[in-house]
Amino acid sequence: MNWKIHQISIPVFDLKKSKNFYEFLLCNKPYDKENISATTDECFISEGDIELRLYKLKNEIYNNQIIQSRRTYASLALRNLDLIINKISEEGISYFANKTRNSITLQEPGLNYIELCDLNTKKSNSSIMNNTWNFHHINLECYDVRSSVNFIKKYLKIKEGIWKAPVELGKVNISPNQLAIFNLNDNHSGIHINKADFTFSWRNNFIHNPTIGGHPAFSITDINFLIKRLKKNDIPFTDAKVYAMPNIHQIYLFDPSANIIEINQNI
């Protein structure tokens, strides 16, 4: 594999409250609704197979060195990053170089941020078996799916995969102009690209519409236990069950900053 997801960055307004929520969601820690001000600009959620970064949104319009986005974005570790940078430079594609992180950040045609770093400088992900959660996918909402897909194929040199529907397929449009995948394995893990589907939640009787705004997805080992904890703490969620990917039970919910989050489990 010539690429992997190195980090997921989720924008939040209250760092302490958000950290507590994600530790409850992914690490089985107690849920404390108390809002305590945080003094730092970012934090990381541990016990997973990638870096999960929460970063505090601020008014930094005057500082073009600070990446601010209301959408979750991914950091991709790629082979031959220098060749990729040369190619996008030749094509006149703008990017921001972060010397501290040894990375660049650009926008694909759907205007989602993507951070790129060198695969050779990043340590291998920890063993999946030892984690309380694992990364599954990042969903990017794009106005023109094929334009965004072609950009990633051409400049990032990642091969497009094929979406495999489950027998229990819900009311989901999986045509290539609506939904595409760059998969890391046969489990639909990787990058999902979709066009906003305004009637998606209405057709499927969902509280949440995961096609709008994009979302990160994480896998856990006992989704029914999480559902019981969500109910106990009065946290609303959509139980989609198996409906879009084979043998994957999915649920959706909002975090304290109104980011849609997906939690799933292979069954």
Protein language model annotation of sequence segments:
Residues 1, 4-13, 34, 43-48, 62-134, 139-140, ...:
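Vicinal oxygen chelate
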Residues 1-2, 10-52, 141-190:
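Core segments of cupin and vicinal oxygen chelate
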Residues 50-53, 111-114, 189, 201, ...:
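Short, charged/polar, Gly/Pro-enriched secondary-structure boundary elements
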Residues 147, 153-243:
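Structured core of small recognition/catalytic domains
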